[in-house]
Amino acid sequence: YTFQDENGRVVFTFPYLNDYTLIGTTEEEHKGDPNDATISTEETIYLKSIISEYFGKNLTNDDIVWHYSGVRPLIEETGKDNRQTTRDYSIEHLQYGNNTLINIWGGKLTTHRVLAEDVLKSLDYHKTWTATEPFANAVNFKHFAHGLINEYPFLDETTAKRLGKSYGKRSLDILKDCKKDKDLGKHYGNGLYEIEVKYLINHEWVKKPESVLLFRTKCGIGMTSSQIEEFQTAFEALINPQK
């Protein structure tokens, strides 16, 4: 759903990970290091208020299981505030002899593919193709998920579907040596097993436990504080086996 408050500010809500609702908005200006961006207390209160009004349920801080923030670059337009500023992007070419430098200004998640295609068009590199080609290792998800469940009956359905959706054909690389449930290694909670964590360390180069829990798998959102603490200790041992 998309909501607007009395001032016209937009708030979005999306179904998320089957059991949650993702709530968000934009237009809060951030100054400083993008890595330091985080939701403010005022923004939290604002989102709880508008969602409580539209959903007819009084949301509290206890309903918040996780939050994250990001910074989106906008192209500055004199005399316009953040709400009026274009969300479009600009591609700049600079030529240094035979070398070309391309700068991209603006852009957002929902335009990343067309932006990339525009860059390639400007280089006469390749005709557009992404609308008809699957992602690398992509599969017919419904059939593939059923295949995983049949091939590895000791996997619960939720975990099998998550692995298939997250890794596609690469989930077979994760599970290739598994013949029984013990081969999955330690279960840290919420469907996260040691064998997947080792794959992420060795093949996706994760360095921090939160990269596993909150970004790669999202399993940490449904884990208890004690499970997270235990995983953090186990992760340190996995990534630094010499210690």
Q: Can you say where each PLM-predicted feature lies in the sequence?
A:
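C-terminal catalytic lobe of FAD-dependent flavoproteins
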Residues: Y1-G24, E28-P241
